[in-house]
Amino acid sequence: MSKKFALTAEQRASFEKNGFIGPFDAYSPEEMKETWKRTRLRLLDRSAAAYQDLDAISGGTNIANYDRHLDDDFLASHICRPEICDRVESILGPNVLCWRTEFFPKYPGDEGTDWHQADTFANASGKPQIIWPENEEFGGTITVWTAFTDANIANGCLQFIPGTQNSMNYDETKRMTYEPDANNSVVKDGVRRGFFGYDYRQLQIDENWKPDEASAVPMQMKAGQFIIFWSTLMHASYPHSGESQEMRMGFASRYVPSFVHVYPDSDHIEEYGGRISLEKYGAVQVIGDETPEYNRLVTHTTRGKKFEAV
């Protein structure tokens, strides 16, 4: 059966060529701004969050932003929206998991994010977090990045280098050093950049290689819009210039076919200066109903809301 929001043949061809497609509308700007205002306050209550570890919520660690869809009703509905999932199904097929979500705030004066690619997501932890079967040619995850606020060049929108999704410039088996004071806001080719306490250049296969920033395109979006891209696409973000005192907020939901092994042989995640137990973790089946037993699923949030698969 044809899905209402499925990618057209032209959109599919564009995605295969460039590694991204969009932006598309999930909400009106007014609806998103009002919803985010309420959600932001509600998220301050972490009593039902899947990760209660003190290490996860101390300081400004990026890991504290993981997987709030597991306890928040709006985010639980968001990851299952047909506007998103119909298009993801066009790419990944009839059985799909949402295996992670995370917030990406950018405050006035914040640095831009380093150019990077992610395949197994071992980049910060040193241990693969998703593994595709050996007979599959490709890895990575589909990221759906939704603008919860307006995102523009001045406040730090995303940047993509089209067509870079099929070749990795980084080796995720290398290790990066977590040194926030040293690595954040380093000027790289004239732009202040960092990677949440790491320097992503430490993973480069060729230490003399530089991204082709002349080919980069900005992804300016209105609140309520989303973009779809391969995590293996070269992507970064601009610094927040401080011209506005409003933060920029993005929410990333990450999707893989259900046969991809999520968190293999792992009972915790340790990265970005934090550590969290996976005791209450489960991936969410957002499309279809077939998933191998090696992937642990959850059907409801920690507050009892059912995830509605498409």
From Swiss-Prot:
Q: What is its EC number?
A: 1.14.20.15
Annotated 2-oxoglutarate binding lies at T113, D114, W115, H116, W145, H235, R248, R254
Which keywords accompany this UniProt record? Iron, Metal-binding, Oxidoreductase
Q: Which Pfam families match?
A: PhyH
From the Swiss-Prot or TrEMBL record, what is one GO molecular function term?
A: 2-oxoglutarate-dependent dioxygenase activity
| Domain of life, per lineage | Bacteria
Cite the binding residues for Fe cation: H116, H235
Report the sequence similarity comment from the record: Belongs to the PhyH family.
Question: What does this protein's UniProt record list under function?
Answer: Involved in the biosynthesis of syringomycin E, a cyclic lipodepsinonapeptide toxin with phytotoxic activity. Catalyzes the chlorination of L-Thr to 4-Cl-L-Thr when the amino acid is tethered via a thioester linkage to a covalently bound phosphopantetheine cofactor of the carrier protein SyrB1 (L-Thr-S-SyrB1), in a reaction that requires oxygen, chloride ions, ferrous iron and 2-oxoglutarate. In vitro, can catalyze tandem chlorinations at the gamma-position of the threonyl-S-protein substrate.
The protein depicted here goes by the name L-threonyl-[L-threonyl-carrier protein] 4-chlorinase
User: Species name for this entry?
Assistant: Pseudomonas syringae pv. syringae
